[in-house]
Amino acid sequence: MIAAMDDFASFCPLTLTTDVIGDRWTPLVIREMLLGNTRFNDIARSLPGMSRSLLTQRLKHLERKGVVETWPSPSGRGNTYHLTPAGKDLQDVLMAMGRWSIAWMYDKLDPSEIDAESLMWWMHRRVDPTTVPDERVTVQFDHTAPERRTYWMVFERRAASVCVVDPGFPVGAVVRCPTEQLARVFSGSESWNAAVRSGTIDVSGRREVVRSMPSWFLWSPWAPDVREHVLAHR
């Protein structure tokens, strides 16, 4: 009987899939690449709990499985990492996994666990290039709790970058709030406008920046599913 089960396991498509993505970190590495990260340091920065040696192992594993390929870096130093067609096709798999957790484990999603720097990094990657102004605009984010931290997000040429040191540009708007509250907005648990109305997020600055800035963000890929879940369980 055991031999027969082993034979089926080697034939089962799900077994083949879990052999590729069936550990804690591999789906998250693929998530980062689906979000556009191609450089090792950027992927590592997005996964602060993962050691660099383990990331190296996971990338090599994915390359062996035909999910990732390496290209010479345009700078001539090192490589960049890119999803193959098979890797890109995992997007629907990961989205379904996220929707499952929202449906059945939503109460375990804890925004208070999110690190401020990781949140800012995620936010800057989820910027809508069609809405970001061409001219440079700097937004200062003052995290008031659990730790007081300040970051600057510079929007320019339809992209964004995050600074942990004041870049010295004129500030178009200042956002002040606890990290947890900003994480709730990013995840879709609460809308930006609702948070501003309630006073849990305070925004000041140039009127046109304050008004248009929320539309510059796409928020979490699962934000629409979270909003739907929240509305259904009110």
Q: Predicted segments — roles?
A:
Residues 9-12, 177:
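Alpha-helix N-cap/N′ positions at the starts of helices
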Residues 1-6:
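Short, intrinsically disordered or compositionally biased N-terminal tails of bacterial proteins
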Residues 7-8, 16-20, 59, 78:
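Basic, helix-initiating cap at the start of DNA-binding domains
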Residues 41-42, 50-234:
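Feature captures hydrophobic
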Residues 12-53:
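N-terminal helix-turn-helix DNA-binding core of bacterial DNA-binding proteins
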Residues 7-10, 112:
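Alpha-helix initiation/capping motif
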